[in-house]
Swiss-Prot record:
This is Imidazoleglycerol-phosphate dehydratase. It catalyses: D-erythro-1-(imidazol-4-yl)glycerol 3-phosphate = 3-(imidazol-4-yl)-2-oxopropyl phosphate + H2O. One of its GO terms (molecular function) is imidazoleglycerol-phosphate dehydratase activity. GO terms for biological process: L-histidine biosynthetic process. The lineage of its organism: Bacteria, Bacillati, Cyanobacteriota, Cyanophyceae, Synechococcales. Belongs to the imidazoleglycerol-phosphate dehydratase family. Pathway: Amino-acid biosynthesis; L-histidine biosynthesis; L-histidine from 5-phospho-alpha-D-ribose 1-diphosphate: step 6/9. PROSITE patterns: IGP_DEHYDRATASE_1, IGP_DEHYDRATASE_2. It is found in: Cytoplasm.
């Protein structure tokens, strides 16, 4: 069974295309017009072993907000599509990622119930030209459109780039753990209720 998602989202502000394969090898082609976001998407792909093809055109002459958010929306929708009814997955994932002095913990549940708890404390307002407040907005968009319950905790860190990159690496590894197939669960839905809510169906 191919666990893939493909989304083409067009608004008056952006045109975003996402192709995602949960059972990939970490191949990534990201061209969003936002260089730092491309770099973080590469972390998700590489450390999550998710194949990603993402292209976006947006009103970055104004700022990166709309592109950042709409890429997050499309990634979340593609993830929900790839997971389907979430049959056979581990469901839960957790990872603690160090990057030099930075240490970030991520725990997530492919529950179908979107929730974000976020406690990064990023010292600088920008990394290059990227507004660091957009990190949270990206994850809000992913969570709301994928049905993830996501907790992000910063345990240490002083360098803004290190903190954010550790966050994306931890997210990637936790997502990989949660979405991998559990051979002991076979075709069962990982819930005592026998069903998990699907994003957009709550």
């Amino acid at each position: 069974m191919m666990r893939t998602g493909e989304i083409h989202r067009v608004t008056g502000e952006t045109d975003v295309q996402v192709r995602l394969n949960l059972d990939g090898s970490g191949q990534c082609q990201a061209s969003t017009g936002v260089a730092f976001l491309d770099h973080m998407l590469q972390q998700i792909s590489s450390h999550g072993l998710i194949d990603l093809e993402i292209s976006a055109r947006g009103d970055t002459h104004i700022d990166d907000h709309h592109t950042n958010e709409d890429v997050g929306i499309a990634v979340g929708q593609a993830l929900a599509q790839a997971l389907g009814d979430r049959r056979g997955i581990h469901r839960f994932g957790h990872f603690l990622a160090p990057l030099d002095e930075a240490l970030v913990q991520v725990a997530l549940d492919c529950s179908g119930r979107p929730h974000l708890s976020y406690s990064l404390s990023i010292p600088s307002q920008k990394i290059g030209t990227y507004d660091t407040e957009l990190v949270k907005e990206f994850f809000v968009a992913v969570v709301n459109n994928s049905g993830l319950t996501l907790h992000i905790r910063q345990l240490d860190g002083a360098n803004s780039h290190h903190i954010v990159e550790a966050c994306f690496k931890a997210f990637a590894r936790a997502l990989r753990q949660a979405t991998e197939i559990d051979p002991r669960r076979a075709d069962a839905v990982p819930s005592s209720k026998g069903v998990l809510e699907q994003a957009g169906m709550n």
